[in-house]
Each structure stands twice: as structure tokens, then as C-alpha cells.
Amino acid sequence: MNQKLVDALWKLQVDPSNTPNAEVIKQNISAEEGQWIQLEILERWLNDGKTLGGWKIGMTSGESRDALGPGVRPFGFLLKERLLNNRAQIIRDQLYRGGVENELCFFVGPSEGSDETDGGLPNIAGCAAGFEINQKRLPPGCPAGVRVGDNLSNWGVVAGHAVEVPKNLEDLSVTLFKTEPGRRGKELEIGRVKSNDHIDDHFDSLRVLAARLEAFGHRLQEGQWVITGAYEKHPFEVAHFRGHFDLEIGDVEVSLTSTQQ
């Protein structure tokens, strides 16, 4: 394993304001090597006292779809300490660079009744409207394999209230709103995205994730959260954000604040 690259990515995980060695951070590694490096980063977080809280499946939507090649879907990990409840408040400056992204969040149920080992669908207990908090730690121009090693930019996830998973997620429409400070509660619509032709089938993504994790020595566990791809997104700024998911999934809210509220 490329230990210099692991060390450089770890330093960025701990402090994204670090300036990495360009020769190290821009090595052209494969997505598979990046996946193993990412798991080494996870191991360092676990050794540092953090807890694994779930997973994400990447390259499933929008411009990033198939960025590593047709059907290539790397995974990323979610730290439990950064799985936040609805209406979470996060200090903007602690996030460095990045943005909020509306994502559907799934909750893994008991393994009984799951057929994921046969390439089937994992047992999912429910889903919720969600936000992924993405932190841009890498400098521009880094190869895709390095992006995988950097955990696909994940910082954390905010999830709304759990509901039963609708059967017709291909019809899902998601709208992102923001309210800026000083606008007296006036909410602005940022954009609206529909599942159809934008994102991989969510159930297929869950199957792919389960198979990918198994190939790398991991598996979905009861209570874990899973996100499956971005809908609308917006760069970080001090503001209140709300995502509305139709099909009776509901809303999720997060506030990026200038100070601790």
C-alpha cells in the first residue's frame, strides 16, 4: 500500500487546511487501490476512538455518474459521530470548503431475512430525507482513485424522520431550499431534481453496495445509515437549508451557523 499517500490523506482528514505534497496527492492510482487506502483511513479513525456508522455508494448521479467507468460504483464510510439528527446546527467554519447535498438516507434493519449474500437486497428498515455534508479536502485535479481514498469527500450526514421505503422511488422528486440570515424567513428555492434519468435505481445501489462491501471484507450492519447519491446541491454558506422529498418521505433541515447556537 502507498503509505505516503495514506499519511497525506489522513492529515487532510484531521485538518483539511493542510497543504499536501502535490506529487504525493496527485498520483494516478486505480479506484481499487483507492478503496483499500480509504479502508486504511477508516482504520485510523477507529483507532482514534471513532465508530463506524454506515456507508455511502458513490458515482451514482448527475455529472459524477460513471466518472470511473460504466457501472463502477466505489463506496465510502460514514462516521457515527457525524450522523446528525434533523435540524442539526453546524458551525460553518469548521467545515472548510464543500457543500450540502440532498440524498435519500436508508436505515439498515436486522440481517434476518436479508439475501444480500446472494446479490439480493439488504434488509432495509426505513428511509428518510437527508443531507450529505461534503468537505472538499483535496486540491483540484486529483485523480479519481485518490478521491476514493479520500472517502469521496464525505464529512457527515443529516437525516430526517424515518418512514417506510416507497416502492416507486424512480418517481421521487427532491427540492432544495435555503433561508439566508437577515431575509426575515424568506425561503428561496435552489433547485428541484427528479430521480428518473438522474440517479441509479436506489434498490440496485443497495445491492451493489452490499456486494462491494463483501468483496472488501465488510458488510452492512443493523442500525447503520446508507446514502445512495446526490440530488440537488449547494456550496457551504451561513444559511438554513431544507430539503423536501415527495412520496410522503418528508423534509430534512440543517443550519450552517457563524457561531455555536
Which stretches of residues belong to each language-model region?
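A conserved acidic, glycine/proline-rich C-terminal tail/linker
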Residues: 202-238
